[in-house]
């Protein structure tokens, strides 16, 4: 519930913000020049100031109706006040003046940056390098109502009917009227090619794109609750980066270019270097700033009437017929190789992080199978599964009766500590062959017989048969001694179990001492000859305990070895069939876990525990479900099928996203790496090609007859 409330609140806030932005933008469209003075302070127009403005506009209208020297009246200028005229904008800025050819008594045009303003002509003498200006809105041009402390209100009180003639002043920050006339042909916006020269190189956008790649990577390793926020942030960063790189510039960001016609002249002294000469060229009152690589080609236009396009900061965009920044960018595009390098490096970083931190085997297999169209297979018999034609990526659901595989040393298993050891129920052997019989061992039977014979004589029970009378046995027990009433049987069972010379050495030595024999062979001969029948041996309790421990220690290796051997003998299934393997080590059987692991039992109990496990797991029901990740057939003809648990919806999206991110990073690294190299090579030769282009245009080489292609 709280998540829905937060989402609705965020949606409402975004809607309000979008509405406010749309309202502000629509208002700025009505006053397009307001953007140029975004940092200006504002105040309200006072009644006295409004009265002075109205009087000035009335007198201006009367003067403009007077015919000029040629008999033509001046073009009407609409400077009527409107609803926005009550807002006064205050700013400090430089004023640029251009002269025009017209009968207008006020033949100058004034600009603040790219915005033309109406400046009362009697204030021209007060223009400085930096001017404190107050403006108000009108229907056409912004009207200056105050300049450097001089106001219309003061002027209208002091002077009436001032002839609107320009007053030359030596205090102005611009050249006087003795300068040559400049004709303003047009005012246009810069082209996209010209804008590209001042546009940033895209390093910030490249870093935003790399940051979005990193956030997409973290979406794969963070909990699901954070994934929507990370993915949303990554999409916003990616969108911002791509928009900054490829979006066309907004109209408001395109600077104005003034198209002028005049005669450029060099005002420098003789002996100046090339850099000083290129900076000392003026067009009338305007000091021109040329691109450095134009220096060899501007001399031919000096002293001649030429069309020149400039920014308000006096930087040239075009001069004459050939020199043009627009044509340079159009014919020889800018090569931003550094941003491609940054994106390629970021893609490689994320690619290496994917390779080392994220398991890619399952996402790739799942994605490929999903693209190929995987099938769902259900089988309850070996024949059904064999006829289904299982492929990697298929969803498999099988059930039946099989055998848990035996884990052997040197073989890999996803489950490191199975409770059914030595059986591994995450691997099921499934075939139609007869079940293997329960394991048997003659050595284990002999070890068990020896252990039981010693236990029966050392720890007799009242109901056990004995070769001595009950009264004698009772008397011996009361004396604290232990009676071995069939010592020969122990010797024979020991000889039967420990047939090798090095087997049970300590036990044999103990029995030799108890039988007062020369060596073990002599003792065995006596037992085989029946000379030990009826021989009773009395033992102290300590000796009896030592004999019991010796028997347990001597029989343990035989039982342990036979248990391992029997387990390995089960690891030889019949040819053919299937081996179903869980990639994550999940058990396919629903059997109760043993109370303890097989190898945690004492050696004398391991064999019985192993037989119980074998009886339960050699023919057990199982259910296996998952996505097929691998299929191969071994030398025995058994088909191995690896299964990965079926992921939930979140897991499926993670698999697809991992593959998509991997392929995207690989493609981005290759593409941007190649682009960075190519752009770097072109960037190195771009200026030489531009100069060669200007040389061919300004100094064309005539083709001699011998070089003509037409014979």
UniProtKB/Swiss-Prot annotation:
InterPro entries: IgaA
Subcellular location: Cell inner membrane
Transmembrane helix recorded as keyword: yes
Species in which this protein is naturally found: Escherichia coli O157:H7
Cytoplasmic face of the membrane: 23-204, 247-339, 677-711
Sequence similarity: Belongs to the IgaA family.
Membrane topology: Multi-pass membrane protein
Keywords: Cell inner membrane, Cell membrane, Membrane, Transmembrane, Transmembrane helix
Keyword Transmembrane helix included in the entry's annotation: yes
Position of the signal peptide: none
Any Pfam family hit: IgaA
Any one Gene Ontology cellular component term annotated for this protein: plasma membrane
Main location as per UniProt: membrane
Segments in the Periplasmic topological domain: 1, 361-655
Transmembrane segments: 2-22, 205-225, 226-246, 340-360, 656-676
The protein, known as: Putative membrane protein IgaA homolog
């Amino acid at each position: 519930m709280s998540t829905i409330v937060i989402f609705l609140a965020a949606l409402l806030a975004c809607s309000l913000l979008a509405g406010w932005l749309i309202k502000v933008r629509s208002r700025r469209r009505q006053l397009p020049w307001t953007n140029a003075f975004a940092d200006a302070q504002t105040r309200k127009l006072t009644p006295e100031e409004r009265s002075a403005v109205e009087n000035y506009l009335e007198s201006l209208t009367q003067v403009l109706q007077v015919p000029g020297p040629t008999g033509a009246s001046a073009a009407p200028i609409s400077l009527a006040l409107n609803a926005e005229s009550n807002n006064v904008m205050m700013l400090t800025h430089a004023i640029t003046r251009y002269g025009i050819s017209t009968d207008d008594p006020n033949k100058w045009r004034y600009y603040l940056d790219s915005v033309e303003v109406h400046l009362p002509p009697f204030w021209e003498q007060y223009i400085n390098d930096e001017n404190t200006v107050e403006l108000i809105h009108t229907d056409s041009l912004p009207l200056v109502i105050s300049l450097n402390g001089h106001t219309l209100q003061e002027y209208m009180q002091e002077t009436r009917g001032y002839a609107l003639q320009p007053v030359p002043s030596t205090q102005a920050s611009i050249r006087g009227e003795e300068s040559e006339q400049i004709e303003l042909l047009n005012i246009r916006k810069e082209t996209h090619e010209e804008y590209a020269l001042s546009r940033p190189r895209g390093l910030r956008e490249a870093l935003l794109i790399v940051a979005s790649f990193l956030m997409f990577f973290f979406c794969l390793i963070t909990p699901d609750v954070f994934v929507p926020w990370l993915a949303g942030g990554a999409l916003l960063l990616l969108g911002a980066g791509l928009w900054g790189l490829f979006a066309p510039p907004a109209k408001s960001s395109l600077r104005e270019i003034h198209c002028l016609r005049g005669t450029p002249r060099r005002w420098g002294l003789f002996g100046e270097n090339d850099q000083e000469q290129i900076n000392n060229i003026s067009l009338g009152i305007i000091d021109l700033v040329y691109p450095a690589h134009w220096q060899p080609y501007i001399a031919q236009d000096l002293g001649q009437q030429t069309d020149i396009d400039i920014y308000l900061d006096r930087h040239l965009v075009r001069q004459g017929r050939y020199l043009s920044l627009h044509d340079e960018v159009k014919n020889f595009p800018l090569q931003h190789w550094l941003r491609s390098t940054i994106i390629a490096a970021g893609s490689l970083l994320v690619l290496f992080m994917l390779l080392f931190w994220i398991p890619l085997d399952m996402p790739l297999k799942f994605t490929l199978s999903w693209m190929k169209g995987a099938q769902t297979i259900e089988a309850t018999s070996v024949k059904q599964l064999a006829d289904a034609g299982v492929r990697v990526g298929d969803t498999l659901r099988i059930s039946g009766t099989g055998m848990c595989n035996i884990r052997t040393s040197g073989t890999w298993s996803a489950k490191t500590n199975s409770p059914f050891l030595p059986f591994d129920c995450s691997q099921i052997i499934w075939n139609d062959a007869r079940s293997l019989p329960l394991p048997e061992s003659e050595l284990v039977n002999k070890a068990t017989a020896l252990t039981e014979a010693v236990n029966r004589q050392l720890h007799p029970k009242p109901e056990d048969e004995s070769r001595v009378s009950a009264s004698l046995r009772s008397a011996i027990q009361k004396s604290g001694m232990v009676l071995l009433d069939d010592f020969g049987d122990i010797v024979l069972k020991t000889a039967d179990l420990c047939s090798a010379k090095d087997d049970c050495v300590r036990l044999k030595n103990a029995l030799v001492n108890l039988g007062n024999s020369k060596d073990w062979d002599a003792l065995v001969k006596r037992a085989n000859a029946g000379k030990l029948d009826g021989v009773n041996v009395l033992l102290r309790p300590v000796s009896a305990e030592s004999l019991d421990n010796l028997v347990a220690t001597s029989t343990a290796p035989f039982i342990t070895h036979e248990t391992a051997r029997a387990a390995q003998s089960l690891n030889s299934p019949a040819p053919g069939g299937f081996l179903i393997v869980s990639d994550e080590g999940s058990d396919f059987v629903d059997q109760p876990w043993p109370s303890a692991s097989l190898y945690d039992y004492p050696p004398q109990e391991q064999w019985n525990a192993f037989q119980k496990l074998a009886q339960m797991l050699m023919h057990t029901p199982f259910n296996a479900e998952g996505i097929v990740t691998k299929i191969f057939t071994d030398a025995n003809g058994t088909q191995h099928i690896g299964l990965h648990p079926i992921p939930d919806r979140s897991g499926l999206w993670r698999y697809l996203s991992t593959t998509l991110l991997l392929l995207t990073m690989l493609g981005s690294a290759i593409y941007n790496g190649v682009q960075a190299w190519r752009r770097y090579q072109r960037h190195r030769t771009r200026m030489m090609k531009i100069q060669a282009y200007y040389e061919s245009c300004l100094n064309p080489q005539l083709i001699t007859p011998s070089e003509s292609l037409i014979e």
